Amino acid sequence: MIEIGETIIKFPPLKEGILIKRYKRFLADIELDDGEVVTAHCANTGPMKGVLWPGRRVRLKYSPSPKRKLDWSWEQAEVPSHNENKKCWVGINTSLPNKLIKHLIEANCLERQFGQISSIKPEVVYGLERKSRIDLLLYPSIQNEDSRKIFVEVKNTTWCEDSLALFPDTVTTRGQKHLKELMSVYPDSRAVLIPCISRSDIELFAPGEIADPEYGRLFREALTKGVEVIPCAFGFFIDHITWEGIRPFQKSRENKQF
C-alpha cells in the first residue's frame, strides 16, 4: 500500500518554462527556460479557472513521435497556494486522473472503500441508452461481503476557492449526464464519483454550482440516490506524483462536510 505523501507515479523530469498563451483550446505557446518558444498540446480544453495564467511557470513533457503532431505536452501549471503564501503545482493533463485512480486501487489504497478488487476494466459501455462509457468498472473479489460491481466515474479537479476544490468550472452537460448514469446503476451496482483533485493544497471538495447550477442540483440528488463520493488528492512534482489522501466533501459551497 502507498502511504500518504509517497510517490504513486514516477517519470523523467519535465521541462519548465513560461506560459505565453493558450489558443484554439488544444494549443499553448510556452517559452522554455533556455529561451526557445515551443507549441505544446493542451489536453484540458475547458476554461481552466484559476490555473490558466499567462506569464506563470509551467511544466512540459517532451515526447517526439511520428504519430504526434506536436512533440510537447503541457502537464503542470504553477499557481499561488493557500498554504502559507507558497506556490503549488497543478496537474492539467486530463488523461492522467483515470490512471492515478487505477494505480490507487491496484495498490490497495482504497481497500477500505472498495474492499478487495479482482479486476478493473476501463471505458466500459453502460448507461440508460448504452451510449456512455464508465471510466473504471471494478469487479470485487469473492471474499467481499458486497459482491456488486462498482461503477467509478473520475473527474479531473483543478479549480478552487481558498482550500475548497470545485468541479466543474464551467457548464458541463456531459458531466450532468454522467451523474444521471451513475444514479441509474444503483442499487444493483455501486455507483462512485471520484473527484481527482490534481493539487495538494486542498482540504475540501464541493460541486462547482456557481459555474453549473444544474450540476450542483444533480450532485445533491445523486447523494440521495446511492451515489458515493470519494475525493482523492494528489501532489504534482517535476518527476513524480504523490498520493495525498482522501478529502471530505460538502453538498454545496456552504453546507456541512461529509
Swiss-Prot record:
Gene3D superfamilies named in the record: 2.40.50.580, 3.40.1350.60
Highest taxon above the source species: Bacteria
Transmembrane residue ranges: none
GO MF assignments: DNA binding
CDD domains from the UniProt entry: SfsA-like_bacterial
InterPro entries in the cross-refs: SfsA, SfsA_C, SfsA_N
Protein family membership: Belongs to the SfsA family.
Protein name: Sugar fermentation stimulation protein homolog
Organism: Prochlorococcus marinus (strain NATL2A)
